[in-house]
Structure formats: structure tokens, C-alpha cells
């Protein structure tokens, strides 16, 4: 915000009186009362010589750059600084007008493609590139209005043809940003030492490195995961988990993948492959058009990042505010296995829990097509399995009356299968689907077998009762039915032992989550797997979580009945119960930057001693250092398993550092780790904390040390750049800078930037900056008289940063300017065609309030 206090102190009483009168004129003009006012310039000091007050007399305002709220059809849609220029209406009255770009109108939901003349006039004859950035002519839209309310600092738009916002998350394709060309690298490194002192001293060292390089060129994304590990007595080993190239096909809402990936699991079980895949990309589609996805609920103690993994792969990362949260837009990917949820609190703590997951009923909106085409080789995690060629085609289509038809074909050497199903949306009663799959396959050493499987699935959310999600499924498989992995995994190198595959006949699952309002959430889930060659396997789970007055509590119970041996040689039932509580102590010991909490935890499992743990954690150094001290006790344990542990984490501008020391009577452990990310781009190389697949490059040139988004340690580097990760693709992401962390000589007129990245993009989130001194400049003409009151002064010759600072001259020829270099040029304009130029140089010492005071002559 501009500090003009010094300028006002030097303005005479007459100047203040004039300002009041001008404000009154503006108010009356905004009220729609057309009157003509006349000011006596002689009332100003110096007799008002050379002063042109015509603009004020006509109820106009000075052109310039103003911060405005943009109001569209009564709703605020944006806030930013905009440049306004003076124009006159049909009756000759002055008014201020700004430039509405194609990108802005698309962001606000205007159907710009329906009005070809909206940008044609302003871009005509100036080249295509200029036309893209041309200003909109709203007269091309019938009944559209535009009005700048100067007193309220609002740009009010009335546009009848705004796209409806019924499809939540449907951001126009015109806003999707493929980002900039870049090289990315996420990295982690850990080293540990364990010293065992039970029966003879033994020391074990371990080292682990993870590298995730990537390249972005236009819409193409190349990604790889490479790891290296070494432990005592073993040599280091490099391993590449996957490498693939992919791109979005925006026009058909699809994605093309070349390399190593997994097929979707909506019809057939997911299959790892190496080859090519083209499929629908649901992240490009509004939430209400997508296939059903599970809901993950929980409670965050602080602003937290929620990570959801399936089969070890990160499928969702989202930032939530403190309190209860619900993730409703999870992609249905992977193998249909359970979801592992991690709540990463901003204080460094983490909650981890599991959400049982069953592929839900298939019910698509009318007219929506979802498909997948895959060709390549089978890619087993077992190196002994042969790389058999395979292909898969699946399709789902939404029909009228709430029906969905779907099916697919799957084939490989020694295996073929076909599936057909029908889904039905029952409206308020939920959705149900029924399908069957016929398979024919030959396992190694066996004859061909054929079989069928039938599956019925149901899911529903009951909003009135607060039941957030219910899912039930039942699957029956006949003898001789096999999935593709069941068959291909048997074709192995003869040097390796044959691996038995599960011969499951039935599978039943149930999951329920119930909201209790202010009392929290309760969840129930269970499953039963029945086999032909072994006893059944059962799982039951229950959980409860709540938060009251920042005190968090969670209780979990689970029961597993596992059978051993392929013919039921043994079975075991294992119960596990845990309770966790966190109580903040900030009101007594902490503060805004060093929240202190105490935690207590109890864990008990069948056949194991009960474990109790008490801890104390907090933050220091502007929340960048997280510390955690814990003591674990096992009463009655003969192994003396009581353990003390200290964890430290430093969240830095260029990455994170971690350290852990653990001590007990029989063992000592020491671990240290580093992690971070790097993006090489056309403007240099930027380092930061670890990021996800989609990254925002924060660019605020010259503003170093600015905090981004409130996350600990995420600050701009010495050049004003940093990385903000885990952006949501095809959705609007708002990135903010904290103005209280700016350097003294830096200003950022607009502290938030909005981007809509495509999946895997590195998007540039640029901020206009003014870096330099703040000064009160006294401007005089060659004859020594001050510049006329109302003259507009701007800084010339600024490139690469924000538009130069601008100010209005007072009645003594003084103007307040910011973002000034040590020396430069000024331009002053007044009246119709009057202007002059001046050179300035800032003095060595600052005046009051850190503002330079200087004089110069305008010629």
C-alpha cells in the first residue's frame, strides 16, 4: 500500500479543501446526478496558474493504475490492479475505461466463442499475436454493460451470456496452461545407523536415494523414478521403477501415455504394462460428470496437505484448512486396493490411516463416454515373469434414463477375456451395476480353463442422514475363472519356483461412513474373501475421530482373520486397537510462531504388549523448525522396550532437512535426511521444497524472502523465485504472497496470482513488482514554479518489472513515488497536450518513515 502521509503533511489547507470538493463531485457523479461544477483555480497557492481542472469539473477521474474488485452479475469474480484510460461517452462526458482480455473473460465464464466480433475490432490489422491480447468490445454482446465505480473501486460487469456454473470445477479450456519448458527434479536422500546391544554389539548402516527427474516440452511430460540403496555388507544398487512420456489431448478430454504405467481398474483388474495407452482423462472433466469416487474424511489440526496413495502411488494431494475435511474428487485408478491416507500437518506431524476401497458401481451421465485402449507387454514386479504381449479395450457410455452400458476385451498369449455390464442410476437411491466377465486361459503346466465371474456393486450418499458414503459389492467366480495376472504370472523362468495364485470364489465388501455433526465421524468397513482351496479371510474395521476446541481424538479398531497354507493348515485372528489424542498448549506456552502440543497414544495388538507413548512437539524460528520429543513405554515387557526419540525437521527455502535420534537399553538409532526439488527454466534454476507432479513457478523479481501460501519455509530466493508444488490440474489455483514478509524497498501491487495448469505442467505465476526507494519528489518548471496540481507523474524506462510507479502532483508540486532506482527519468502530463521530463537522483540518507526527499526540475 502506498504511503502518502508525508505528501499530505506538506499540502496546504486549500489543497485539502479542493480534495474534499473533488470527492464530493465524484460521489455525486457516481450517484447518477448530472450537474456541472466550476472550481476557482485562484484559490490554490500561486493563484492556480497553469492548473487544468476541467476533468474534475466534469465529474471525471484521473487515468492510472487502480486496484479494483471485478463484479460480474452481482458476484465478485476477481481482484487485481488494472490500468484505466480516459474516454468520453456519446454526450461528451469523461469516464475511465480498462482493457478486458480474452483470458479474463474466459476465466469469468463468458462464452467468447459465440461472439466473433468481441475481439476482432481491436485486433484488426495489428497481427494475430496482438489480437490475442486485444481488448474486448462488450458492445458485441447484446445488453452487456461495463461500469467503473471509482468511489467503491469496483469494475461492475453485466453480461447475460455467462456460462452456467452448474458443473463444479469446469474451468474453460482456454484457461488451461501447458506451462513453460522445464527440467524438473525431485530428490530425497537418507542415511541411517542402527546399533544393537542385546546379545553382542552389532552396527548396521543404510543409505537410500530417490530421484524423480522430468522434462516438460509443450504438452509433453517425461517422468522417471530411480532409486539407489545400500546397506552394510551389500553393494549399492540402482533401480528404475518406471519411465514414461505422456501428454493431454485436450480436445477429446483424453491422455496419451507411452512407456510404463497401469491400466484402469473399473472393468478389469489393473494390469502393469510397458507400451502405449490412450484413455479418457477424468481430471479434465467436471466433478459431476465423473464416475463415482470414494470419499476420504478426516480432521486436520492445522492447515495440512492430504496425500492419498494406492499401491504406493500418489493419486491425490490437496491442501485443506484446519478442521474436518472431505476429499470427494479422488481419481479411480490403480488396482482397486485400499487407500493409504496421510495427513501432513503444517507443524510437521502426520496422521496415517487406511480407507478400504472397492471399485464402485458404474453409472455415468447421459452422453458421457469413457474409454481405454492399451497395447504393449506385461510388466510384472517379478523379474522372473515373462514379458508377454497384451492388449486391452474398454468403453463405458451413459444412456438416457440413467442407464450406462459398458464392456471390454482383454487378450494376451495364453489368455483372453470379455466383459459386459449395465449400470443404473437410481437417483436418490444411489447407483447399482451388474456385470459378467468370461475368461479363457492356460496357466503354465496346465490345460486351458474357462470360467465366469459375476459382480454386483452398489453405492450411495445419504445427505439427509449425514451418511457420507455406503458401498457394497458381491462377486462370484466359477471354477476355471482367472484374471490376466493369475495366468501370466505363472509363465516364469524355470529356474524359479512356481508361485501359487489365489483361487477365490466369492468376495463381499461393505463400507460405511457416518457424520455425527459436531461430534465427529464414525466409519465401519468389512470384507470377506472365500476360496476353494483354503478357509475364508475376514476383515472388520471401525474408526471414530473428532475435534473439539482444537483438541483432537481418534480411535481405531480392526480385526483380521488370516488363513495360512494353501489348504487351511492354520488360521489366526488378530485384533488391533489404537487411540491417539493431541492437546494444544499454545495458550500457556506457545505463540503464533511456535505452537506447542502434547500427544498421547496407546496401541495394542493380539499377542503383543500394550504400548503407550507420550510426546511434546512445537515449532520455532518462524515455524521453520519443527521439534518432537517422545517417550514410548511398554509396561511388563521383558525386552526392556522403552524408547526415547527426538525428531527435528527444518523447512528451508531450498529444501528440507530431517534428523532423528532414538535410544533404548538395547538399541540406538540415528537418521539424517535431505529432500528438495529443482526446476531449470528459461529464467534460471530455482530450488525449493519437494513438489508434486504439477508445479507453480513463483516469479516476483527482486522480492526476496517473501512467504508463499503460509507454508513454513516456502519463501522466494535471492532473485525472488521459488516453487509451489502439489497444484491441482485443470482447476484454478490461487497463489499468494505475504506482504508482511516483503523487503523494505519492495512492493507487489497484486499479492495473489491465479493459474489453471494442465497435468504435470510447470506454470509461471508471475507477480508485478516495484523494487526500489520510496520518495517524495518536488517538481518545478524551469522558471521555478511548481508543476500544476493534478499532473500525473510516471517513471520512465522500466522494463522487466511492474509498470513504473505513478502519482498525482499536489498544489506544491510534490508527488509520492515508489519502486525508484537510485537515478532515473520521470514524465509529467497535464491538460490536453502538456508534458515535461525530469531526471532524479535519490539522496544517500532517507527522511522520515524511510522516505527519500528530493527535488528536480522538469523540462
UniProtKB/Swiss-Prot annotation:
<keyword id="KW-1134">Transmembrane beta strand</keyword>
<keyword id="KW-0998">Cell outer membrane</keyword>
<keyword id="KW-0812">Transmembrane</keyword>
<dbReference type="InterPro" id="IPR025949">
    <property type="entry name" value="PapC-like_C"/>
</dbReference>
<dbReference type="InterPro" id="IPR025885">
    <property type="entry name" value="PapC_N"/>
</dbReference>
<keyword id="KW-0614">Plasmid</keyword>
<dbReference type="InterPro" id="IPR018030">
    <property type="entry name" value="Fimbrial_membr_usher_CS"/>
</dbReference>
<keyword id="KW-0472">Membrane</keyword>
<keyword id="KW-0732">Signal</keyword>
<dbReference type="InterPro" id="IPR037224">
    <property type="entry name" value="PapC_N_sf"/>
</dbReference>
<comment type="similarity">
    <text>Belongs to the fimbrial export usher family.</text>
</comment>
<dbReference type="InterPro" id="IPR042186">
    <property type="entry name" value="FimD_plug_dom"/>
</dbReference>
<dbReference type="GO" id="GO:0015473">
    <property type="term" value="F:fimbrial usher porin activity"/>
</dbReference>
<dbReference type="GO" id="GO:0009297">
    <property type="term" value="P:pilus assembly"/>
</dbReference>
<dbReference type="GO" id="GO:0009279">
    <property type="term" value="C:cell outer membrane"/>
</dbReference>
<dbReference type="InterPro" id="IPR043142">
    <property type="entry name" value="PapC-like_C_sf"/>
</dbReference>
<dbReference type="Pfam" id="PF13953">
    <property type="entry name" value="PapC_C"/>
</dbReference>
<comment type="function">
    <text>Involved in the export and assembly of AFA-III afimbrial adhesin subunits across the outer membrane.</text>
</comment>
<dbReference type="InterPro" id="IPR000015">
    <property type="entry name" value="Fimb_usher"/>
</dbReference>
<dbReference type="Pfam" id="PF13954">
    <property type="entry name" value="PapC_N"/>
</dbReference>
<feature type="signal peptide">
    <location>
        <begin position="1"/>
        <end position="28"/>
    </location>
</feature>
<dbReference type="Pfam" id="PF00577">
    <property type="entry name" value="Usher"/>
</dbReference>
<keyword id="KW-0813">Transport</keyword>
<protein>
    <recommendedName>
        <fullName>Outer membrane usher protein AfaC</fullName>
    </recommendedName>
</protein>
Amino acid at each position: 500500500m502506498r504511503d502518502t502521509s508525508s505528501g499530505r503533511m506538506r499540502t496546504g489547507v486549500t489543497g485539502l479543501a479542493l480534495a474534499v470538493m473533488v470527492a464530493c463531485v465524484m460521489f455525486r457523479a457516481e450517484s447518477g446526478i448530472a450537474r456541472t461544477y466550476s472550481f476557482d483555480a485562484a484559490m490554490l497557492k500561486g493563484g492556480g496558474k497553469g492548473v487544468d481542472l476541467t476533468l474534475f469539473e466534469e465529474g471525471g477521474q484521473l487515468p492510472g493504475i487502480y486496484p479494483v474488485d471485478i463484479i460480474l452479475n452481482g458476484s465478485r469474480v476477481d481482484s487485481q490492479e488494472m490500468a484505466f484510460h480516459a474516454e468520453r461517452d456519446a454526450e461528451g462526458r469523461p469516464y475511465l475505461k480498462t482493457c478486458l482480455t480474452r483470458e479474463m473473460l474466459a476465466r469469468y465464464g463468458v462464452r467468447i466463442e459465440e461472439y466473433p466480433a468481441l475481439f476482432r475490432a481491436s485486433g484488426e490489422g495489428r497481427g494475430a499475436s496482438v489480437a490475442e491480447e486485444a481488448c474486448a468490445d462488450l458492445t458485441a454482446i447484446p445488453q452487456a454493460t461495463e461500469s467503473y465505480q471509482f468511489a467503491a473501486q469496483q469494475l461492475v460487469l453485466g453480461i447475460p451470456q455467462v456460462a452456467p456454473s452448474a458443473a463444479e470445477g469446469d474451468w474453460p479450456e482456454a484457461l488451461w496452461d501447458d506451462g513453460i519448458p522445464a527440467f524438473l527434479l525431485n530428490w530425497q536422500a537418507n542415511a541411517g545407523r542402527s546399533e544393537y546391544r542385546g546379545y553382542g554389539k552389532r552396527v548396521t548402516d543404510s543409505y537410500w536415494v530417490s530421484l524423480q527427474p522430468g522434462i516438460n516440452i509443450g504438452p509433453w511430460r517425461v517422468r522417471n523414478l530411480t532409486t539407489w540403496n545400500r546397506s552394510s555388507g551389500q553393494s549399492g544398487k540402482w533401480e528404475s521403477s518406471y519411465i514414461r512420456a505422456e501428454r493431454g489431448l485436450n480436445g477429446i478430454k483424453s491422455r496419451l501415455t507411452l512407456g510404463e504405467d497401469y491400466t484402469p481398474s473399473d472393468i478389469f483388474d489393473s494390469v502393469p504394462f510397458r507400451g502405449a495407452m490412450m484413455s479418457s482423462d477424468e481430471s479434465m472433466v467436471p466433478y459431476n460428470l465423473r464416475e463415482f469416487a470414494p470419499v476420504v474424511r478426516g480432521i486436520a489440526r492445522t492447515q495440512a496437505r492430504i496425500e492419498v496413495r494406492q499401491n504406493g502411488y500418489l493419486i491425490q494431494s490437496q491442501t485443506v484448512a484446519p478442521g474436518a475435511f472431505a476429499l470427494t474428487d479422488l481419481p479411480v485408478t490403480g488396482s482397486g486396493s485400499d487407500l493409504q491416507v496421510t495427513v501432513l500437518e503444517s507443524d510437521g506431524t502426520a496422521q496415517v490411516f487406511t480407507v478400504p476401497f472397492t471399485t464402485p458401481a458404474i453409472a455415468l451421465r447421459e452422453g458421457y463416454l469413457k474409454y481405454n485402449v492399451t497395447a504393449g507387454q506385461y510388466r510384472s514386479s517379478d523379474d522372473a515373469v515373462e514379458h508377454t504381449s497384451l492388449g486391452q479395450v474398454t468403453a463405458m457410455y451413459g444412456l438416457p434414463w440413467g442407464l450406462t452400458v459398458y464392456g471390454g476385451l482383454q487378450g494376451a498369449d495364453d489368455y483372453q477375456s470379455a466383459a459386459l455390464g449395465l449400470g443404473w442410476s437410481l437417483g436418490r437411491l444411489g447407483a447399482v451395476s451388474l456385470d459378467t466377465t468370461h475368461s479363457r486361459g492356460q496357466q503354465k503346466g496346465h490345460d486351458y480353463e474357462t470360467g465366469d465371474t459375476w459382480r454386483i456393486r452398489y453405492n450411495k450418499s445419504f445427505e439427509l442422514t449425514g451418511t457420507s458414503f455406503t458401498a457394497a459389492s458381491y462377486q462370484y467366480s466359477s471354477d476355471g475363472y482367472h484374471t490376466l495376472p493369475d495366468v501370466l504370472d505363472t509363465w516364469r523362468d524355470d529356474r524359479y519356483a512356481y508361485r501359487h495364485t489365489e483361487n477365490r470364489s466369492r468376495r463381499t465388501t461393505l463400507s460405511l461412513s457416518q457424520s455425527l455433526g459436531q461430534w465427529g465421524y464414525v466409519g465401519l468397513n468389512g470384507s470377506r474373501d472365500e476360496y476353494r482351496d483354503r478357509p475364508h479371510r475376514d476383515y472388520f474395521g471401525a474408526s471414530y475421530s473428532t475435534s473439539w476446541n482444537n483438541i483432537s481424538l481418534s480411535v481405531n479398531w480392526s480385526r483380521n482373520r488370516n488363513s495360512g497354507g494353501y489348504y487351511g493348515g492354520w488360521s489366526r485372528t488378530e485384533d488391533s486397537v489404537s487411540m491417539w489424542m493431541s492437546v494444544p498448549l499454545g495458550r500457556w506456552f506457545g505463540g503464533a510462531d511456535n505452537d506447542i502440543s502434547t500427544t498421547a497414544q496407546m496401541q495394542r495388538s493380539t499377542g503383543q504388549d500394550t504400548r503407550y507413548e507420550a510426546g511434546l512437539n512445537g515449532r520455532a524460528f518462524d515455524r521453520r523448525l519443527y521439534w518432537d520429543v517422545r517417550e514410548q513405554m511398554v509396561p511388563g515387557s521383558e525386552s526392556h522396550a522403552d524408547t526415547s526419540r527426538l525428531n527435528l525437521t527444518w523447512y528451508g527455502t531450498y529444501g528440507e532437512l530431517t534428523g532423528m535420534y532414538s535410544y533404548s537399553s538395547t538399541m540406538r538409532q540415528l537418521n539424517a535426511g535431505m529432500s528438495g526439488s529443482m526446476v531449470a527454466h528459461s529464467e534460471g534454476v530455482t530450488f525449493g521444497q519437494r513438489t508434486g507432479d504439477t508445479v507453480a513457478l513463483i516469479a516476483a523479481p527482486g522480492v526476496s524472502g517473501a512467504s508463499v501460501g503460509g507454508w513454513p519455509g516456502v519463501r522466494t530466493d535471492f532473485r525472488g523465485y521459488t516453487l509451489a508444488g502439489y497444484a491441482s490440474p485443470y482447476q484454478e489455483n490461487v497463489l499468494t504472497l505475504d506482504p508482511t514478509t516483503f523487503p523494505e524497498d519492495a512492493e507487489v501491487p497484486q499479492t495473489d496470482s491465479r493459474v489453471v495448469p494442465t497435468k504435470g505442467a510447470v506454470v509461471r505465476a508471475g507477480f508485478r513488482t516495484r523494487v526500489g526507494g520510496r520518495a517524495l519528489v518536488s517538481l518545478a518548471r524551469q522558471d521555478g514554479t511548481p508543476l500544476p496540481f493534478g499532473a500525473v507523474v510516471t517513471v520512465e524506462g522500466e522494463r522487466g518489472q511492474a509498470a513504473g510507479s505513478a502519482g498525482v502532483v499536489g498544489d506544491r508540486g510534490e508527488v509520492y513515488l515508489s519502486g525508484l532506482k537510485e537515478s532515473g527519468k520521470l514524465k509529467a502530463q497535464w491538460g490536453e497536450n502538456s508534458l515535461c521530463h525530469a531526471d532524479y537522483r535519490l539522496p544517500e540518507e532517507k527522511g522520515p518513515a524511510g522516505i527519500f526527499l528530493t527535488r528536480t526540475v522538469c523540462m
